[in-house]
Structure formats: structure tokens, C-alpha cells
Amino acid sequence: MKQLLNTLFVTSEDIYLSLDGENVVASREQQAAARYPLHTLSGIISFAYPGASPALMGACAQRGVSLAFCTPRGRFLARVCGESNGNVLLRRTQYRTADDPAQSCRMARSMIFGKLYNARWSVERTRRDHGLRIDGARLEQASARIKALLPLVAEETSLDALRGLEGTGATAYFSVLDEMILGEKPVFSFPGRSRRPPLDPVNAMLSFSYSLLAHDCAAALESVGLDAYVGFLHRDRPGRSSLALDLMEELRPCMADRFVLTLINNRIVKRADFTYRENGAVLLSASARRSVLKHWQERKRESLTHPYLGEQLSWGMVPYIQALLLARTLREDLDAYPPFLWK
């Protein structure tokens, strides 16, 4: 099984990355600030503008270390990829499946089922654990609305209709997300989803966490030989990792959303951790990004029992396991893709 190595996050905006022997060197004003052995890293995510040296990019490509560049706000810019893993037959099958609406719908159906299942379970978990602190009736209604969609998703044969069901479920889920935030109101109130730019602290953290999850999903797909840019639910768009977005759908509620709720409800983040721009945008401060990244890595090391495999593994391995199951489904080793159903 793949070993879960470390991910290096570069959050200082003036850091330049280079290669010295077998080490990644982080430099500020041409002075080495830190060194990291390359063999201990599975990925590097830079939120800095200076960039990285061609030598480091080449070494990462050769060794399968994912190197991604994001803006300081967390918006994905680019990723350095080396030679594709796996054989060409798997990718040919992926492309044929993506070009076939019926087969695409079969794959997307499982992913959306997983997303709505996990969204409902997240709501139910809040009802169970914090019944005296929430509006239980509202959460029960939202849970029932999402539950009613699951059999419809399981039988749907149209991609457009499937997207409509997903949207209906997302509306029900986000309508009660504010109830799942247990403290620090009104700073951490959730009026609804906003992006590009996020307009409140909760949306700022959601967008940042989704960027991290998308990177992990893209790296996982590439590691098993799939093309992260050709999806089944999300269609082709230049520069968009469509299959990574597909894969992360089922993981959003349990990996990203619950992570954000934990940060808020455990008072790990505060109002002072955000900057408020004149255009209404709300962004995580540099120190807050470092704190969020630290807790993200800690969360990925926590263990769980995989619902399909029945094996103990870390949360950080979940995208890799799901990517592997997706590849096995495309090879017809499995009859259908088994989504991650959080329990």
C-alpha cells in the first residue's frame, strides 16, 4: 500500500524553492531558510509567487512528487506532472467512458450518491452529538430531504438530471450548515455558499479546504495512472482537473466540511484570523493559513476503518484508495465504482 508521506506547504509569499542535491531548499532573499529531504515528501504546495527552480520541478516530475502552485489566497494555478503512471490502456478506457454519456452517468451516479449520503450523515451526526444545542427539527427535515434523493440518484440515467438532483441535495445540506456551527456567532454565521471571492469567514475556510482536497485528489488519480483532467460529471474545461473535482464530491462533506466545522466549533480559528477587503472578500491571514494547514495534516493522519475495504487506514489515504477503486472499475475488475460512504 502507498505510504502516506509528508506534504510541504509553502505559505510565506516571498519564498523561492530550489534543489540542492537531494534536498528541497526554501530561500528568502537568496538566503536558505529551511531544507527538506525530497524523499520524505509526497507533494509540495506553494502559496508563494517567486516559484521554484527548473531543477526542482524536474526532480519532482521524475520522482512522482506532486508540485502545485496556488495564489496566496489558495486558488489553484498549476501543477507540475511527470511521466504518466500506469499503462495507456487504462487512460484509453477512461477517455472512452468520458465520451459515452451513459457510462459517464454510471460513474457520476456513484460519486453523487456518495456525496449526498455523506452530507446526510454529517447532518445526522450533528443531530446525535449536539441535539440540545441545535434546531433539531430543521436538521431532521434537511436530512429527510437528502435521504429522499438517494434512491432517485441511484436510478438516474441522465447526467443533466443527476446534476439537478445533486444541486437539490446541496441546497438542503447548506441550508442547515449554519445550524451545525455551534459557536462564535455572528462571526462564523453561514448565509450561503459564496466563492471567487468568499464573502465571509466560513466560505473562506471552505474554499481553502476544497483547494487542498482537490490537490490531494489530483495527486491520487495521477498516482494510479488516471488523467485528472478528464472527468465524468465535470466536463472538459481548459486547465480544470475535472476528474479530481469528480472524486472530491463524495469527500467534501466528510473531509473538508467537517474539518472546517471542527476548526470553528473547537475555537481553533477566530475573527482576527481573517482579513476583510473593500470589495467584500474575506480571506484567511497568513498565520491562519499556516494553522489551518497544520491541522489539515493532523487530520489526514487520523485513522478510520474504510467502509468498503474494512481496513484501518488514515484519512489522508482515502483519496488514494478511492482513485485505486475507480481505476479497478474502469478495468472492469469491479462491477461498479464503490463510493466512500462515511460511517
State the predicted function of each range.
Residues 1-72, 82:
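Terminal-proximal segments
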Residues 40, 48-121:
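A surface-exposed, charged beta-strand/loop segment in the N-terminal or early-internal portion
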Residues 1-20, 29, 35, 87-343:
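Active-site helix-to-loop segments that bind/position phosphate- or nucleotide-bearing substrates
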